[in-house]
């Protein structure tokens, strides 16, 4: 079953609070990939607190080079090396030079077979990547169309491979259930204001993790000038992307709690289902 585990290690932005650390999200999928999205200050300690060794990470993907998103990297990289691992780092191309000084491999995308990760340009004040994660969950077959086929053929068809049975070549598209989506997608925006080009590039997602630095008490134009979003901006993006799940994070330290964000989120009729997590909250999402 395609299942994602998301642990929100840091849900703040720019300045930490005692109960709200800087941006970092741990993602674990049903295939065994372990991915860290952004690396706020002290993130390695938070990983240890949830029982995850830095050396076990498949990828660390940072959205941009503002300090609140990357100050946890040096310690994370060093500890991973001490533990016998090596961090695979993703970041914007403009940051590859400085990131490579950490002694790690740096790229702007990842292809792990059934999981692909790529950079999507967002609208911030510096060069920044949103990270689009796409899983190939295979085909769901139309039982009437595959009746009588051997099990080995069914297995290959589900994986997306064509087969030859009795001299007939069968392509998975020919016998698939048209109502089933082969790919599942998650977008993590990092810092961004409203971004039409991001929406156009991405198309649709199942899960959207979108910054909501501000609730509704700040002039939206001011927020956008700073390269940030309000709750309303994030909801609008989720609807445009037809997301089933929207997670709001990167909450400004100006808010002593997230009550207003949650009030606004609670007014949104699903879809999307809107969540405003606290630090260390875990969200399980079935794709």
Swiss-Prot record:
Self-association and partners: Homodimer.
Binding site for Zn(2+) 2: 68-69, 191, 250
Lineage, broadest ranks: Archaea, Thermoproteota, Thermoprotei, Thermoproteales, Thermoproteaceae
Name of the featured protein: Ribonuclease Z
Function: Zinc phosphodiesterase, which displays some tRNA 3'-processing endonuclease activity. Probably involved in tRNA maturation, by removing a 3'-trailer from precursor tRNA.
Gene Ontology molecular function, alphabetical: 3'-tRNA processing endoribonuclease activity; zinc ion binding
Cofactor: Zn(2+)
Catalytic site positions: 68 (proton acceptor)
Family, similarity comment: Belongs to the RNase Z family.
Residue numbers binding Zn(2+) 1: 64, 66, 124, 191
InterPro entries: Metallo-B-lactamas, RibonucZ/Hydroxyglut_hydro, RNase_Z/BN
Enzyme Commission number: 3.1.26.11
Key words of the record: Endonuclease, Hydrolase, Metal-binding, Nuclease, tRNA processing, Zinc
Highest taxon in the source lineage: Archaea
